Amino acid sequence: ITAALAAAAVSGCSSDAARRIEAGGPRSLVSVNKINMADWNEAAASLVNDMLSSGCLDSFKPKPVKMAVGRIVNRTSQAIETDLLSRQITIALNNSGNVRVVSSDAYSREQEKYEAFVNDKKVSLPKLVMTGKIIEDRESVDGVREVTYIFMLSLSSGGEVVWESQKQIAKQAD
């Protein structure tokens, strides 16, 4: 009986039961050494809000303006999937009605060329190109570790930068 009670007590103290949480929400795990879903969500929302509120898209006609997605360069110590940032941004921009993101896959590009040929039109090039960079700054003082991730984004048109912004997310751990 004692062994059974001890086993029940030990198993009751820890649980491997999984539970669903909101991705990037308040119950998500936070790590200093990793860009978490909450970081991706915060960076994307901040950059999109900054872009849309800046008025940088107002001068482009007709709406929605075509935009291509260039490289998002990873300059962190992690192997990260930059699509976690760029895809959230392009979804929000497409949904805003101000921007239409041009597909970069070969099949879509060939289809666009074919439709232009059949309709005796030229293939229209994107007026905007979105590029970016993610860098990190690491610091440690008296046993406290801190990392700041800097998410930089730019829009260019005809070789000129028409908008740029950055979002910094800093995290600490003892």
What are these model-derived regions, one by one?
Residues 14-19, 127-173:
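Amphipathic beta-strand/beta-sheet edge segments enriched in Tyr/Trp
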Residues 23-35, 65-75:
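Acidic/histidine-rich, surface-exposed loop or edge segments in extracytoplasmic proteins
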Residues 33-44, 78-86, 142-146:
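Solvent-exposed, acidic/flexible segments
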Residues 7-33:
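Bacterial Sec signal peptide processing site at the extreme N-terminus
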Residues 8, 123-127:
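Structured loop/turn residues at beta-strand edges in well-structured enzyme cores
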Residues 45-117, 121-122, 160-164:
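N-terminal segment of the mature soluble domain
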